[in-house]
Design a protein with these regions (language model features):
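C-terminal, well-structured catalytic/ligand-binding subdomain of enzymes
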Residues: 1-6, 10-11, 15-17, 21-50, ...
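A conserved hydrophobic secondary-structure block that centers on an alpha-helix together
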Residues: 53-60, 65-66
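Short arginine-rich
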Residues: 67-73
Protein backbone atom coordinates (compact mmCIF):
# COMPACT_ATOMS: atom_id res chain seq x y z
CA UNK A 1 0.00 0.00 0.00
CA UNK A 2 1.15 3.56 -0.76
CA UNK A 3 -0.67 6.19 1.37
CA UNK A 4 1.45 8.98 -0.14
CA UNK A 5 0.05 8.08 -3.56
CA UNK A 6 -3.43 7.35 -2.16
CA UNK A 7 -3.20 3.79 -3.40
CA UNK A 8 -3.94 0.53 -1.61
CA UNK A 9 -4.42 -3.06 -2.71
CA UNK A 10 -5.81 -4.53 0.49
CA UNK A 11 -7.01 -3.14 3.80
CA UNK A 12 -9.72 -2.75 6.41
CA UNK A 13 -11.21 0.34 8.03
CA UNK A 14 -12.70 1.17 11.42
CA UNK A 15 -16.19 0.17 10.23
CA UNK A 16 -15.01 -3.40 9.67
CA UNK A 17 -15.20 -2.99 5.91
CA UNK A 18 -12.34 -4.85 4.21
CA UNK A 19 -11.37 -4.87 0.56
CA UNK A 20 -8.73 -6.69 -1.49
CA UNK A 21 -7.70 -6.74 -5.13
CA UNK A 22 -6.43 -9.44 -7.41
CA UNK A 23 -5.63 -8.12 -10.86
CA UNK A 24 -7.79 -9.57 -13.63
CA UNK A 25 -6.36 -9.97 -17.12
CA UNK A 26 -9.40 -11.02 -19.14
CA UNK A 27 -12.16 -8.47 -18.52
CA UNK A 28 -11.05 -5.71 -20.90
CA UNK A 29 -10.90 -6.95 -24.47
CA UNK A 30 -8.25 -5.97 -27.00
CA UNK A 31 -4.49 -5.92 -27.22
CA UNK A 32 -3.65 -4.39 -23.83
CA UNK A 33 -0.26 -4.79 -22.20
CA UNK A 34 -0.42 -6.48 -18.79
CA UNK A 35 1.14 -3.46 -17.06
CA UNK A 36 -1.53 -1.18 -18.53
CA UNK A 37 -4.47 -3.09 -17.11
CA UNK A 38 -6.37 -1.67 -14.13
CA UNK A 39 -4.28 1.50 -13.64
CA UNK A 40 -6.79 2.87 -11.12
CA UNK A 41 -7.27 -0.27 -9.02
CA UNK A 42 -5.14 1.00 -6.15
CA UNK A 43 -6.74 4.44 -6.05
CA UNK A 44 -10.22 2.93 -6.05
CA UNK A 45 -9.46 0.66 -3.10
CA UNK A 46 -7.90 3.53 -1.15
CA UNK A 47 -10.98 5.70 -1.70
CA UNK A 48 -13.45 2.90 -0.94
CA UNK A 49 -11.73 2.23 2.38
CA UNK A 50 -12.21 5.91 3.22
CA UNK A 51 -15.96 6.04 2.59
CA UNK A 52 -17.51 2.54 2.58
CA UNK A 53 -18.84 0.57 5.54
CA UNK A 54 -20.79 -2.25 3.88
CA UNK A 55 -20.95 -4.35 0.75
CA UNK A 56 -23.97 -2.27 -0.27
CA UNK A 57 -21.91 0.91 0.10
CA UNK A 58 -19.33 -0.56 -2.24
CA UNK A 59 -22.03 -1.37 -4.81
CA UNK A 60 -23.17 2.26 -4.66
CA UNK A 61 -19.56 3.40 -4.94
CA UNK A 62 -19.05 1.37 -8.11
CA UNK A 63 -22.38 2.57 -9.49
CA UNK A 64 -21.48 6.23 -9.09
CA UNK A 65 -17.77 6.53 -9.92
CA UNK A 66 -16.80 8.12 -13.20
CA UNK A 67 -16.77 5.78 -16.21
CA UNK A 68 -14.59 4.49 -17.71
CA UNK A 69 -13.09 3.96 -14.28
CA UNK A 70 -9.67 2.52 -15.17
CA UNK A 71 -10.48 -0.60 -13.13
CA UNK A 72 -9.85 -4.19 -14.15
CA UNK A 73 -9.91 -6.40 -11.09
CA UNK A 74 -11.50 -8.99 -8.90
CA UNK A 75 -12.35 -7.21 -5.63
CA UNK A 76 -13.02 -9.30 -2.53
CA UNK A 77 -15.16 -7.51 0.07
CA UNK A 78 -16.39 -8.31 3.59
CA UNK A 79 -18.14 -6.09 6.12
CA UNK A 80 -19.15 -6.15 9.80
CA UNK A 81 -22.80 -6.87 8.92
CA UNK A 82 -22.21 -10.37 7.57
CA UNK A 83 -21.69 -9.27 3.99
CA UNK A 84 -19.15 -11.05 1.80
CA UNK A 85 -18.83 -10.87 -1.97
CA UNK A 86 -16.49 -10.94 -4.92
CA UNK A 87 -16.79 -8.24 -7.58
CA UNK A 88 -15.50 -8.63 -11.12
CA UNK A 89 -15.03 -5.05 -12.27
CA UNK A 90 -14.03 -3.56 -15.61
CA UNK A 91 -13.92 0.05 -16.73
CA UNK A 92 -17.67 0.39 -17.24
CA UNK A 93 -19.49 -2.33 -15.32
CA UNK A 94 -19.27 -4.95 -12.62
CA UNK A 95 -20.74 -8.27 -11.58
CA UNK A 96 -21.22 -9.23 -7.94
CA UNK A 97 -20.86 -12.79 -6.64
CA UNK A 98 -22.51 -12.99 -3.20
CA UNK A 99 -20.81 -15.51 -0.91
CA UNK A 100 -24.02 -15.71 1.15
CA UNK A 101 -26.06 -16.87 -1.85
CA UNK A 102 -26.05 -20.70 -2.01
CA UNK A 103 -26.76 -20.58 -5.73
CA UNK A 104 -23.56 -18.57 -6.23
CA UNK A 105 -21.41 -20.06 -3.47
CA UNK A 106 -22.82 -23.45 -2.41
CA UNK A 107 -19.87 -24.03 -0.08
CA UNK A 108 -19.87 -20.49 1.34
CA UNK A 109 -16.84 -19.08 -0.45
CA UNK A 110 -15.91 -17.36 -3.70
CA UNK A 111 -12.33 -17.62 -4.97
CA UNK A 112 -10.47 -15.87 -7.77
CA UNK A 113 -6.91 -15.68 -9.05
CA UNK A 114 -5.90 -13.51 -12.03
CA UNK A 115 -8.85 -14.18 -14.30
CA UNK A 116 -12.57 -13.41 -14.02
CA UNK A 117 -15.38 -15.88 -14.65
CA UNK A 118 -17.24 -13.24 -16.64
CA UNK A 119 -14.21 -12.36 -18.76
CA UNK A 120 -12.90 -13.72 -22.04
CA UNK A 121 -12.70 -17.52 -21.85
CA UNK A 122 -9.25 -19.05 -21.36
CA UNK A 123 -7.59 -15.63 -21.16
CA UNK A 124 -5.87 -14.20 -18.11
CA UNK A 125 -3.67 -16.01 -15.59
CA UNK A 126 -3.93 -18.31 -12.62
CA UNK A 127 -6.16 -21.15 -13.82
CA UNK A 128 -3.87 -23.80 -12.35
CA UNK A 129 -3.48 -21.83 -9.12
CA UNK A 130 -7.27 -21.56 -8.90
CA UNK A 131 -7.57 -25.36 -8.99
CA UNK A 132 -5.36 -25.59 -5.91
CA UNK A 133 -7.19 -22.81 -4.04
CA UNK A 134 -10.55 -24.43 -4.76
CA UNK A 135 -9.28 -27.85 -3.71
CA UNK A 136 -8.06 -26.59 -0.34
CA UNK A 137 -11.11 -24.44 0.43
CA UNK A 138 -13.69 -27.05 -0.57
CA UNK A 139 -12.01 -29.63 1.66
CA UNK A 140 -11.71 -27.15 4.54
CA UNK A 141 -15.40 -26.21 4.23
CA UNK A 142 -16.39 -29.87 4.36
CA UNK A 143 -14.36 -30.28 7.53
CA UNK A 144 -15.58 -27.00 9.05
CA UNK A 145 -12.28 -25.25 9.47
CA UNK A 146 -11.17 -22.28 7.36
CA UNK A 147 -8.68 -20.42 9.55
CA UNK A 148 -5.88 -17.93 8.92
CA UNK A 149 -3.41 -20.68 9.76
CA UNK A 150 -4.88 -23.01 7.15
CA UNK A 151 -4.91 -20.32 4.47
CA UNK A 152 -1.28 -19.41 5.09
CA UNK A 153 0.01 -22.98 5.38
CA UNK A 154 -2.07 -24.76 2.75
CA UNK A 155 -2.66 -21.95 0.24
CA UNK A 156 -0.17 -19.08 0.56
CA UNK A 157 2.70 -21.58 0.97
CA UNK A 158 1.34 -24.35 -1.23
CA UNK A 159 3.73 -26.01 -3.66
CA UNK A 160 1.16 -28.28 -5.27
CA UNK A 161 0.52 -28.22 -9.01
CA UNK A 162 -2.72 -29.95 -9.93
CA UNK A 163 -1.93 -30.26 -13.65
CA UNK A 164 1.38 -31.99 -12.98
CA UNK A 165 -0.21 -33.78 -9.99
CA UNK A 166 2.78 -33.09 -7.78
CA UNK A 167 3.47 -31.61 -4.37
CA UNK A 168 7.05 -30.50 -3.83
CA UNK A 169 6.69 -31.25 -0.12
CA UNK A 170 6.36 -34.97 -0.87
CA UNK A 171 10.13 -35.39 -0.64
CA UNK A 172 10.39 -36.64 -4.21
CA UNK A 173 11.85 -33.34 -5.38
CA UNK A 174 14.63 -33.02 -2.82
CA UNK A 175 18.23 -34.17 -2.71
CA UNK A 176 19.33 -36.95 -3.27
CA UNK A 177 16.42 -37.82 -5.61
CA UNK A 178 16.88 -34.54 -7.49
CA UNK A 179 19.20 -31.56 -7.51
CA UNK A 180 16.84 -29.71 -5.17
CA UNK A 181 15.93 -27.18 -7.86
CA UNK A 182 12.56 -26.84 -9.58
CA UNK A 183 10.79 -24.38 -11.89
CA UNK A 184 8.49 -21.81 -10.30
CA UNK A 185 5.46 -22.50 -12.51
CA UNK A 186 1.85 -22.16 -11.34
CA UNK A 187 2.49 -22.54 -7.63
CA UNK A 188 0.47 -20.11 -5.51
CA UNK A 189 3.52 -18.30 -4.07
CA UNK A 190 5.43 -16.84 -7.01
CA UNK A 191 8.77 -15.10 -7.34
CA UNK A 192 6.95 -11.75 -7.50
CA UNK A 193 4.61 -12.35 -4.55
CA UNK A 194 5.08 -9.52 -2.05
CA UNK A 195 2.63 -10.37 0.74
CA UNK A 196 -0.24 -12.57 1.90
CA UNK A 197 -3.06 -11.20 4.04
CA UNK A 198 -6.07 -12.83 5.69
CA UNK A 199 -8.72 -10.45 7.00
CA UNK A 200 -10.57 -12.11 9.86
CA UNK A 201 -13.79 -10.15 10.16
CA UNK A 202 -16.56 -10.01 12.73
CA UNK A 203 -20.17 -11.16 12.84
CA UNK A 204 -23.12 -8.78 12.77
CA UNK A 205 -23.46 -7.12 16.17
CA UNK A 206 -19.80 -7.53 17.10
CA UNK A 207 -17.41 -4.61 17.49
CA UNK A 208 -15.73 -3.88 14.11
CA UNK A 209 -12.49 -3.01 15.87
CA UNK A 210 -12.08 -6.73 16.58
CA UNK A 211 -11.29 -7.26 12.89
CA UNK A 212 -7.79 -8.70 12.48
CA UNK A 213 -5.50 -8.43 9.46
CA UNK A 214 -3.19 -11.42 9.66
CA UNK A 215 -0.28 -10.32 7.52
CA UNK A 216 2.79 -11.93 5.99
CA UNK A 217 5.00 -9.29 4.41
CA UNK A 218 7.35 -10.35 1.64
CA UNK A 219 7.57 -13.78 0.02
CA UNK A 220 5.13 -15.91 2.09
CA UNK A 221 7.29 -19.08 2.26
CA UNK A 222 10.05 -16.91 3.74
CA UNK A 223 7.85 -14.78 5.98
CA UNK A 224 5.94 -14.90 9.27
CA UNK A 225 2.29 -14.04 9.93
CA UNK A 226 1.65 -11.07 12.24
CA UNK A 227 -1.80 -10.00 13.51
CA UNK A 228 -2.75 -6.36 13.07
CA UNK A 229 -5.75 -4.55 14.55
CA UNK A 230 -7.08 -1.38 12.90
CA UNK A 231 -7.31 0.37 16.27
CA UNK A 232 -3.60 -0.12 16.93
CA UNK A 233 -0.67 1.65 15.32
CA UNK A 234 1.46 -0.41 12.95
CA UNK A 235 4.51 -1.85 14.74
CA UNK A 236 7.86 -0.63 13.44
CA UNK A 237 8.68 -3.99 11.86
CA UNK A 238 5.52 -3.70 9.72
CA UNK A 239 5.93 -0.02 8.84
CA UNK A 240 7.72 1.48 5.85
CA UNK A 241 11.41 2.09 6.47
CA UNK A 242 12.89 4.69 4.14
CA UNK A 243 16.41 3.27 4.33
CA UNK A 244 15.28 -0.27 3.53
CA UNK A 245 12.73 0.82 0.93
CA UNK A 246 10.15 -1.42 2.60
CA UNK A 247 8.95 -2.53 6.02
CA UNK A 248 11.74 -4.39 7.88
CA UNK A 249 9.88 -7.73 7.84
CA UNK A 250 9.16 -7.35 4.14
CA UNK A 251 12.76 -6.43 3.35
CA UNK A 252 14.08 -9.41 5.34
CA UNK A 253 11.72 -11.87 3.66
CA UNK A 254 12.38 -10.59 0.14
CA UNK A 255 16.14 -10.66 0.82
CA UNK A 256 15.90 -14.33 1.81
CA UNK A 257 13.92 -15.08 -1.33
CA UNK A 258 16.36 -13.21 -3.55
CA UNK A 259 19.53 -14.66 -2.05
CA UNK A 260 18.46 -18.20 -1.15
CA UNK A 261 15.46 -19.16 -3.28
CA UNK A 262 15.58 -17.33 -6.62
CA UNK A 263 19.33 -16.83 -6.70
CA UNK A 264 20.21 -18.40 -10.06
CA UNK A 265 20.60 -15.32 -12.23
CA UNK A 266 22.66 -16.34 -15.20
CA UNK A 267 20.87 -14.92 -18.22
CA UNK A 268 17.26 -14.17 -19.04
CA UNK A 269 14.45 -16.35 -17.72
CA UNK A 270 16.45 -17.81 -14.85
CA UNK A 271 14.30 -16.02 -12.26
CA UNK A 272 11.86 -18.93 -12.63
CA UNK A 273 14.30 -21.41 -11.12
CA UNK A 274 13.36 -22.18 -7.52
CA UNK A 275 15.94 -23.54 -5.09
CA UNK A 276 13.48 -25.83 -3.35
CA UNK A 277 16.13 -27.50 -1.21
CA UNK A 278 16.77 -24.18 0.55
CA UNK A 279 13.06 -23.69 1.25
CA UNK A 280 12.19 -27.22 2.31
CA UNK A 281 14.31 -30.34 2.69
CA UNK A 282 14.36 -33.76 4.27
CA UNK A 283 16.72 -32.60 7.02
CA UNK A 284 14.17 -30.06 8.26
CA UNK A 285 16.54 -27.13 7.80
CA UNK A 286 14.72 -25.29 5.01
CA UNK A 287 13.65 -21.67 5.39
CA UNK A 288 9.97 -22.59 5.66
CA UNK A 289 10.71 -25.27 8.23
CA UNK A 290 12.85 -22.98 10.39
CA UNK A 291 10.11 -20.35 10.43
CA UNK A 292 7.38 -22.75 11.60
CA UNK A 293 8.22 -22.46 15.33
CA UNK A 294 8.56 -18.68 14.97
CA UNK A 295 5.05 -18.39 13.55
CA UNK A 296 3.71 -20.89 16.09
CA UNK A 297 5.02 -18.60 18.83
CA UNK A 298 3.11 -15.70 17.25
CA UNK A 299 -0.11 -17.74 17.30
CA UNK A 300 0.49 -18.90 20.87
CA UNK A 301 0.71 -15.30 22.03
CA UNK A 302 -1.85 -13.70 19.71
CA UNK A 303 -4.76 -16.15 19.78
CA UNK A 304 -5.40 -15.95 23.56
CA UNK A 305 -5.20 -12.16 23.29
CA UNK A 306 -7.66 -12.20 20.40
CA UNK A 307 -10.04 -14.38 22.43
CA UNK A 308 -9.78 -11.99 25.38
CA UNK A 309 -10.62 -9.03 23.14
CA UNK A 310 -13.68 -10.91 21.86
CA UNK A 311 -14.78 -11.65 25.41
CA UNK A 312 -14.31 -7.99 26.39
CA UNK A 313 -15.96 -6.79 23.18
CA UNK A 314 -13.13 -4.36 22.43
CA UNK A 315 -9.43 -4.11 21.69
CA UNK A 316 -7.14 -2.98 24.50
CA UNK A 317 -4.25 -1.29 22.70
CA UNK A 318 -2.06 -1.34 25.82
CA UNK A 319 -2.03 -5.13 25.74
CA UNK A 320 -0.59 -5.03 22.22
CA UNK A 321 2.63 -3.30 23.27
Amino acid sequence: NFPSLKEAWVGSNTAGFALMNTQSYNLELGDIADDDRGPKNGEVIYRALEICATVEDFCHFLDTIQKPSGIEANFGVIDAQGGAAMFEVDGNSYKMFDANDPDVAPHGYVARTNFSNGGELNKGYGYVRFLEVDRVLSKACAMGGITPQLIFTDIARSFRNNILDIDLRSGDFNYPKTSGWFTDQDFIPRNNTSCSIVVQGVKKGENPELTVLWTILGYPPAGVAVPLWVKDNLPAMMSYDKEKGAAPLSAASLKLADEKVFHFKQGGGTKHYLHWENLYNLKGTGIMQKLVPVEEKVYQEALPLQQKFYKDGKVNVKELD
